[in-house]
Structure formats: structure tokens, C-alpha cells
């Protein structure tokens, strides 16, 4: 079994979606100042970095992040590559083996954007007809490798359609170093009461293939993963 950490690092260099507050990490107490311990204050949006969008994000009466069943956030997931297009619609999604799948993670050209120092509006996204196709095929969770599943100048149509039809959205994934295929997704958002979203730690697990070595996180060369 291999474990892949598909969560972006939270740091002050993290790009944020336009209009969201920047992430700030400030020391409250510090050993270097003679305090008893290191304690920091974090200021951030509920939609910073790798995060989950529940229905409450676009509907005041929708389920909040703490009300989502964990069974929805843990289970088999298909990681599919969709490269060479910014607008991912029905035509592109029809090429994917989605029969019987409930969780879909889209690895797109967005993967390169995490290397940029600032937010980029030139990212791949779902179109309205793509969102409609996912609902028709029974997908319950869709993830993507940048900060929004919808185009930058979108009016929320894609978000609302997905969320109103029972899909939750996992945004801000780091899928670099992870090949397309079937995995077990474990996504644990912070349990924010009434939350319209929450940062999440997301990992993928796959079976170790015969003849392979130790299990390493693809985003670091330092520590093997149990």
C-alpha cells in the first residue's frame, strides 16, 4: 500500500482566490522570546488551500461542512487525467470510465500552477454541461487540482448545480506525482460548526505493487509513510 499526500502546504506564500483574505501565520508566543511555548495565530479563509465545499457554500439552508457524512469523504475514488483543455465539459468527461464511480478527482494542466508565486486565473475548470454529466452519472464528490471547480468569471452556476444535486466539491488538490488510477480517498475537513467550507487534509491510498520498495510520499524525499 502506498500513501499519497494530495494536500497543499499552508503557508503565507499560498495563492488565494481573488477576494479571499491572504493566509497569515503570526507568532503569539515564542520560545525565542522567552515564552513557555511556541503558539501561533492563523488567519485564513475557509476556502484556502486544499478545502471542501459543502452545500452551505452557496445555500444558507444547505448542509454545512460539519453535517456531511464522513462516509462520503472516505472511499474508492477515480483519479483521471484531463489534459490539454481549460473547459472540461461533457465531451471530455464521457471519455472517462465513470460507471460505478462515486468520487472523481480531476488531474488537469492546473498541476503546474502551484509552482507560480501568485494566483493564476488561467486554470482548467468544469463547464455547466460537464457538471450536469457528473450528476447524471451518479458522482457524489468531485475534486480538482486548483482553487475552484468553476471558471474565474463564473457566476456560481457550476457550484450551485453540483451542490444542489448532492455533490460535494474538493478543491485545491496537489496531484503532482500521482498517476491516474483507482485509489482510496481519505478527506478529513476541519469540523467547523455551521461552516460554509473548511480546509482539509486529503490523502490517497493504493495497493503496493509486487517488487516495489518502501512507501514514500511523492512530495518529499525525507520520510517514508506507514
State the predicted function of each range.
Residues 1-226:
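Active-/binding-site microenvironments in catalytic and ligand-binding cores
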Amino acid at each position: 500500500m502506498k500513501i499519497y499526500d494530495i494536500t497543499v502546504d499552508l503557508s503565507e506564500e499560498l495563492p488565494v482566490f481573488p477576494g479571499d483574505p491572504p493566509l497569515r501565520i503570526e507568532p503569539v508566543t515564542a520560545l525565542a522570546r522567552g515564552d513557555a511555548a511556541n503558539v501561533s495565530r492563523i488567519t485564513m479563509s475557509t476556502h484556502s488551500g486544499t478545502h471542501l465545499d459543502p452545500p452551505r457554500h452557496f445555500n444558507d439552508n444547505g448542509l454545512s461542512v460539519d453535517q456531511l457524512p464522513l462516509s462520503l469523504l472516505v472511499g474508492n475514488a477515480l483519479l483521471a487525467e484531463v489534459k490539454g483543455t481549460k473547459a472540461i465539459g461533457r465531451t471530455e468527461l464521457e471519455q472517462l470510465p465513470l460507471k460505478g464511480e462515486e468520487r472523481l478527482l480531476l488531474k488537469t494542466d492546473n498541476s503546474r500552477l502551484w509552482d507560480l508565486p501568485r494566483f493564476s486565473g488561467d486554470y482548467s475548470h468544469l463547464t455547466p454541461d460537464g457538471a450536469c454529466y457528473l450528476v447524471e452519472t451518479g458522482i457524489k464528490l468531485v475534486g480538482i487540482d486548483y482553487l475552484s471547480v468553476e471558471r474565474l468569471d463564473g457566476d456560481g452556476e457550476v457550484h450551485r448545480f453540483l451542490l444542489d444535486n448532492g455533490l460535494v466539491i474538493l478543491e485545491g488538490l496537489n496531484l503532482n506525482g500521482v498517476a491516474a488510477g483507482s485509489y482510496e480517498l481519505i478527506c478529513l475537513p476541519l469540523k467547523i460548526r455551521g461552516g460554509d467550507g473548511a480546509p482539509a487534509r486529503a490523502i490517497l491510498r493504493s495497493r503496493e505493487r509486487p517488487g516495489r520498495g518502501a512507501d514514500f510520499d511523492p512530495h518529499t524525499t525525507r520520510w517514508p509513510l506507514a
